[in-house]
Amino acid sequence: MRELLRTGRATIELVQGDCLEVLPTLPEGSIDVVVTSPPYNLGIDYASYDDRQSREQYLEWTRRWTKAVARVLAPKGSFFLNVAGKPSDPWGPLEVAQVCRESFTLQNTIYWVKSIAVEVDEATLSVGHYKPINSRRYLNDCVELVLHLTHEGKVELDRLAIGVEYADKSNVTRWRSAGADRHCRGNAWFVPYSTIQSRDKDRPHPASYPPALAAQAIRLHGVERAQRTLDPFSGIGSTALACAELGVDHLGIELDALYHAEAVRRVRGVTSPSLFARR
């Protein structure tokens, strides 16, 4: 099943199917940016996919789809791969990274911070969302990895597109790189989930990421250079939503019919720019 949607300046193509069958049909080097989050093999209850493979099976499957992505990624393209483990099995993301090393260069390691507690003026400020862990051995898991993979590690980025203002404004005139009061955000990205009332109604997927995370990755690569983007594990369309509102053409591939239908519904609901899409 294939849906072709127009949202403002973007053409969003959503395909229901197996990415290992769809990716070989794409021209070589035809994708500028890939943003995705595959199943982590943590035993999550997806509607269709079996998330309980042996480690060997899972890594071999990872090898197959990452090589397929490498073929379609443009020479100066960026591949942002969100991957996570669990406290009792922390090696999973590192083993996935080693598989990716067969086809890509790791250019940047980004830490997606979902929740954080910081000391501010002698008070503790806790913001974001986390799932409490009932354990005396493990800490609550508040961070996931986003691996920025490229062919040769030489892709130039639009770092100030996601830059932040200087807290000390004297730096604006002190540093030549200060520009229009912006400096590099760095590789720790605080992107919390939006508050929802009902998982089944508002976010009917067991392992989605916020559209804002995908938007930030695409803006870092450079919106002007992102002619076509890809998410081979589209889920309920987080990357598609980001692309719709950034005005970037996108192809999303999703195995499950229910998640695919929800992605189509969500993209059709895009009518105006959101905060995460603003330059």
Q: What do the PLM-derived regions correspond to, one by one?
A:
Residues M1-R9, V264-R278:
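Short, conserved SAM-binding/catalytic segment
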Residues R2-E262:
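Core catalytic lobe of class I
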Residues R159-G163, S274-R279:
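Short, flexible loop/turn segments with low-complexity composition
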